[in-house]
Amino acid sequence: MEFWYTEQHTPDVRLSIRVNRQLYSGQSEFQRIDVFESPEFGRFLTLDGYMMLTEKDEFIYHEMITHVPMCVHPEAENILVIGGGDGGTVRELLRYPSIRHIDLVEIDEMVVDVCREYLPSTASCLSDERVHIHYEDGLRFVRKPIDTYDLIIVDSTDPFGPGEGLFTKEFYGNCFKALKEDGIMINQHESPFYEQDAYAMQRMHQRIVHSFPFSRVYQVHIPTYPSGHWLFGFSSKNRRPVEGVDFARWKALGIKTRYYNTQLHAAAFALPNYVEERLEDVEPQH
């Protein structure tokens, strides 16, 4: 008998992956956590039935959420990651010897424990001495620091459930205050393709552009996320993501990547017309 994992992307569209076995299933204080093993995508993690990462394609997400801002701000030393309990974003950050301190704020300790046991390819880095894990609500955590971080990465789940507070005006305003003058915020910006996802993306974008003087969006292809077409947000007080960036300096670091490169970095900010139109619909008119 075949065993399939199926996720509903819209009322009329589903993603299905054949599964060899289920490695873990548990209920934390916040959500249901499952880990499966599949022939095509290797091990994968779901939260409340929604795909978070697979061993086969997680490198795309984690490289693009990390190396884009680090290329723009190579002097970044003090980093805040909100969410990201699987460890993939932290793993990529730790490839930069210049980074001295990473605060990882994850609301659900069980996510970290499960990933450490079943997804060591992303989570084994969490024991690094530069990483400081805080098991608390990111919305609450970010109220405290002022002018503290060079980079904030909002590696959150979708805008419902435990991560819901990470999509509010209050949250983005506090991120702005927590950043240094030349700081950058990166957030996973949802998908522009299916109507329900696009609406969530627009609401988020509207709140960010009201909190930051400069905000751009870049795109990436992630096969196991709804539609495969995914966005990240790049927001800052004054830095630009392409103009004036010293790409040669990043290349000189010799960091070996599987998805990210400096040509792709620049190209990712060129968006399809339908995405530009959805973003412009919620941006302030000048």
Feature map (PLM): residue ranges:
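Conserved beta-strand signature within the Rossmann-like core of class I S-adenosyl-L-methionine
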Residues: D182-H189
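SAM/dcSAM-binding transferase cores
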Residues: M1-D34, Q206, S227-H286
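Short, structured loop/turn "capping" segments at alpha-beta junctions
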Residues: C125, M185, S215-R216
